[in-house]
């Protein structure tokens, strides 16, 4: 700091120097973004133009930059594959994937990308599964989505059949299926049968409602969270997650999550 004694306006000098100190403390006290304790996002909708997630390459790049800010260096792109609404195929997903990979390289973003999908268990899935058209994650993991209205009637049989064929089944955001929150023993049955659970960080924030939040915390208490996902559809979701992982609650539950979460083991 400059020496005030060499200046003629001592009062002005005092005010200026104190403002410098105040603003210096303000900027120094700004918290750095807390990083996640893992480096792999296993569930997101960053692939452009194939579902109701990212709608452009530019938006995808912004979302990937947000992932990097949270400490993510590997992203498994899991766009919706759903009857009628998003009947994506290997070809449509691969085309978008190659465009995004080229854009990421051109932008100089340090991010490993992997192509997979989030499969709604419906009639379109039955057709794709029978034709052996699924795009699994590394390690032959497959992300499955249940209906939000009711459980698939033959869920147990399907999971067993997929496991026999070598797939490692992951149930996407089970905390969001409110019909399970009223009979949580079903969670235990599915987990014991070999299904793994991926919980959305957004659910902890209350973004999907209090019932989903309560179920997410139940999973923490019972040590049944195998994977965490952003389920990011836009940059707004990223900002909500960033705020949450800076919270006291996240600092409290993160050590428990570290005991069970295996995101980085999937690749």
Please identify what each model-predicted range represents:
Residues 81-85, 120-122, 176-180, 204-207, ...:
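Active-site environment of divalent metal-dependent phosphoester hydrolases
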Residues 194-206:
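His/Asp/Glu-enriched short active-site or ligand-binding loop at hydrolase and phosphoryl-transfer sites
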Residues 224-240:
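Short acidic/histidine-rich active-site segments
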Residues 23, 87-196:
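Extended substrate/RNA-proximal surfaces in nucleic-acid metabolism proteins
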Residues 17-109:
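An N-terminally biased module of ancient metal coordination in phosphate/nucleic-acid-related enzymes
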Residues 68, 163, 220-221:
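Non-catalytic positions within long, well-ordered alpha-helices that form the structural scaffold/packing
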Residues 8, 20, 25, 29, ...:
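Mid-to-C-terminal alpha-helical segments outside catalytic/metal-binding sites
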């Amino acid at each position: 700091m400059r020496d005030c004694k060499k200046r003629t306006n001592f009062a002005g000098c005092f005010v200026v120097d104190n403002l410098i100190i105040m603003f210096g403390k303000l900027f120094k006290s700004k918290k750095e973004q807390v990083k996640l304790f893992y480096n792999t996002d296993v569930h997101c909708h960053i692939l452009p133009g194939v579902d109701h997630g990212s709608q452009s390459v530019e938006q995808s790049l912004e979302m990937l930059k947000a992932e990097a800010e949270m400490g993510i260096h590997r992203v498994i792109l899991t766009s919706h594959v759903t009857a009628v609404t998003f009947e994506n195929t290997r070809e449509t997903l691969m085309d978008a994937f190659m465009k995004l990979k080229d854009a990421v390289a051109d932008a100089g973003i340090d991010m490993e990308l992997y192509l997979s999908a989030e499969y709604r268990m419906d009639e379109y899935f039955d057709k794709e599964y029978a034709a052996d058209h699924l795009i699994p994650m590394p390690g032959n993991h497959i992300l499955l989505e249940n209906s939000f209205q009711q459980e698939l009637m033959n869920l147990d049989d399907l999971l067993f059949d997929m496991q026999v064929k070598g797939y490692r089944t992951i149930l996407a955001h089970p905390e969001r299926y409110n019909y399970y929150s009223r009979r949580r023993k079903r969670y235990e049955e599915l987990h014991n049968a070999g299904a793994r659970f991926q919980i959305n960080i957004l659910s902890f924030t209350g973004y999907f409602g209090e019932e989903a939040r309560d179920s997410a915390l139940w999973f923490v208490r019972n040590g049944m969270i195998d994977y965490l996902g952003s389920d990011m559809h836009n940059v707004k979701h990223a900002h909500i997650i960033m705020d949450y992982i800076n919270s006291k609650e996240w600092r409290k539950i993160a050590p428990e999550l570290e005991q069970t979460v295996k995101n980085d083991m999937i690749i």
